[in-house]
Amino acid sequence: MSMTDLLSAEDIKKAIGAFAAADSFDHKKFFQMVGLKKKTPDDVKKVFHILDKDKSGFIEEDELGFILKGFSSDARDLSAKETKTLLAAGDKDGDGKIGVEEFSTLVSES
């Protein structure tokens, strides 16, 4: 399954473009722009599994740095600062990674 099976390619392109500048990433606005906020909980979990590149059941800090590439292969990497900010927002239990429930909460709070 690919991201465009779940989200509009046009919405993804617009959202990636909106955060093309370094240190401009805002996960709340991004999740809204790609249409993730409007998706069912099941679809949000499918997106999580696409972003969980190593299939560990978690999105670790190194995977978070490449989160935009999970939506579009030509997107930029997040900066270290953006990655830490995203991790802090999503890692509710403080284990240094984001699980599927934490990701679902992160999306629903956006």
From Swiss-Prot:
PANTHER family (alphabetical): PARVALBUMIN ALPHA
Pfam families: EF-hand_7
This protein's UniProt keywords: Acetylation, Calcium, Metal-binding, Muscle protein, Phosphoprotein, Repeat
Lineage, uppermost ranks: Eukaryota, Metazoa, Chordata, Craniata, Vertebrata
Span of domain EF-hand: 39-74, 78-110
GO cellular component: cytoplasm
Entry coiled-coil feature ranges: none
Keyword Phosphoprotein attributed: yes
Name of the protein in question: Parvalbumin alpha
Function: In muscle, parvalbumin is thought to be involved in relaxation after contraction. It binds two calcium ions.
PROSITE patterns in the record: EF_HAND_1, EF_HAND_2
Residues bound to Ca(2+) 1: 52, 54, 56, 58, 60, 63
Cross-referenced InterPro entries: EF-hand-dom_pair, EF_Hand_1_Ca_BS, EF_hand_dom, Parvalbumin
Chain residues that bind Ca(2+) 2: 91, 93, 95, 97, 102
Annotated gene: PVALB
Domains (record comment): AB domain, comprising of helices A and B, is involved in structural stabilization, protecting the hydrophobic core of the protein. It is required for high-affinity binding of Ca(2+) and for Mg(2+)-binding.
Family: Belongs to the parvalbumin family.
Modified residues (Phosphoserine): 2, 8, 24
GO molecular function: calcium ion binding
Modified residues (N-acetylserine): 2
Organism annotation: Gerbillus sp.
